[in-house]
């Protein structure tokens, strides 16, 4: 189980990313349209003004039940350990164990 503070920090980053997403997208679109170099530098400065934690690269997928940051399956939102336990307990419909 991940510490509560790490999970809260990740939730805060998600909210910040949603808040500043439109600003980042519009300034990136402006950079592609502007031709003069000095204007581009001004827009780059504006792009650097939002907080660092609002960048989408700072986000990390976490397990829905445990908060584990590694070995996550996107389809289920679970880590590999929990996914395996739930499949063995028949809690995930449509998921089958491999046996050969």
UniProtKB/Swiss-Prot annotation:
Sorted UniProt keywords: Chloroplast, Plastid, Ribonucleoprotein, Ribosomal protein, RNA-binding, rRNA-binding
Pfam name, any one: Ribosomal_S14
InterPro entries per UniProt: Ribosomal_uS14 (IPR001209), Ribosomal_uS14_bac/plastid (IPR023036), Ribosomal_uS14_CS (IPR018271)
Entry-linked PROSITE patterns: RIBOSOMAL_S14
GO CC entries: chloroplast; small ribosomal subunit
Residue span of region Disordered: 1-22
Biased composition (Basic and acidic residues): 7-20
Keyword Phosphoprotein: no
GO molecular function, one term: structural constituent of ribosome
Keyword Ribosomal protein belongs to the record: yes
Top-level lineage group: Eukaryota
Location within or outside the cell: Plastid, Chloroplast
Biological process according to GO: translation
Binding partners and assembly: Part of the 30S ribosomal subunit.
Function summary: Binds 16S rRNA, required for the assembly of 30S particles.
Family membership: Belongs to the universal ribosomal protein uS14 family.
UniProt protein name: Small ribosomal subunit protein uS14c
Lineage of source species: Eukaryota, Viridiplantae, Streptophyta, Embryophyta, Tracheophyta
Gene: rps14
């Amino acid at each position: 189980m991940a510490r509560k503070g790490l999970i809260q920090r990740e939730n805060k980053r998600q909210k910040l990313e949603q808040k500043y997403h439109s600003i980042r997208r519009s300034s990136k679109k402006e950079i592609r349209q502007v031709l003069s170099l000095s204007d581009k530098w001004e827009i780059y400065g504006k792009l650097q003004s939002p907080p660092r934690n609002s960048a989408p690269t700072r986000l990390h997928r976490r397990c829905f039940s445990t908060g584990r940051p590694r070995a996550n399956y996107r389809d289920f939102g679970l880590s590999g350990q929990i996914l395996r336990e739930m499949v063995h307990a028949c809690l995930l419909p449509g998921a089958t164990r491999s046996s050969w």
